[in-house]
Amino acid sequence: MRVRGGTAAVAVVMCVIAGGCGRAADQTEQTPGVSESPSGTTPSSSAVNPAPTEPAPPTASPAFGYTPELTAEKGAQGTVTYDVHLPQLSGGVDAVRDRFNDGIRTALGDLVENLPGPSKDLTVSIDDGDLGPGPETTRVAVIGPHVVAGIQVYLWYAGGAAHPNQSVSTTVINSDTAQPITYDDLFPNQYAAMERLRQVLPGLDPTGRVRQDNVNVRLEQWLPTPTGVRFYVPVSHAAGDFVPITVPWDRIRDLVDPKIVPVFSQ
C-alpha cells in the first residue's frame, strides 16, 4: 500500500467538490470550477432521492478507544459562508485521531476555497446536507480495529443558481499506520477497476439512476464496510447528485490491493 504524509496527503483521499472528482453538476448556473453533469438529465428545482440500494450505515459506535463526535463549524471566508458539522474523533491513538480530524477540516477548507470559482467573487453558502433517505449525512462512519473513516455531506448554494447541490467527501485512515488510504491504494490497476465498476454498479442500483455511462470518473468518494466498499456515484442533480452503492467484496476482491483487504476486515 502506498502511503502519503502530511496534510496534502489527506486531501488526496477526499472528493471535496464536484469538479475535483468528476461530480455531476449542472452546466449553466454553477461555479466555473464545477463540471457538467455526466448524464443528460435536465436538473430540477429539487433532487430526487429514491430509496438507496441498502440502508446507510449508522454513525460508528465508540470502539478501540475512539469516540465519534460531530462538531459545529460556522464562519465565513471571502464570499463563502458556512454553517456545518464536522465528523471528529476523540481519544484513541494521537497520530490517528489527529490525521483523521485534520483531514476532515482540510476537506471543508478546500470546499470553501474552491466553490467561489477562479474569480473568487461568487457568493456561496454551505450547510449540512443529506443524500437521504436513510439518512445519509455527515458522520464518523467506521471505527474498526485497523481503520477509521468519515463522510461529509454538505448542501451548497451559489448565488444565482437554480438550486443547491450536494457535495460528498470521505476520509479513510489506516489506524495501524496513521496514513490515509486512497482510491489509488485501493485499486492498483485503475483501468481494470473502472471497467469492473462500470459493469457491476448499475446492477446493484435498483433505483435505476446509475448507468454504465455514469461511471466514467475515478470514484474517490468511498467508505469501507464489513461487506464491501460503499461508493458514492455522481449523477445529475435531478437524480440526487450522488447514489450510494455498496459493492460486495466478492465482486471486486481480485482487484483490491491484497494488503488492503485485511485492513478493512472488521
Positions of the model-derived regions?
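Hydrophobic core
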Residues: 14-18
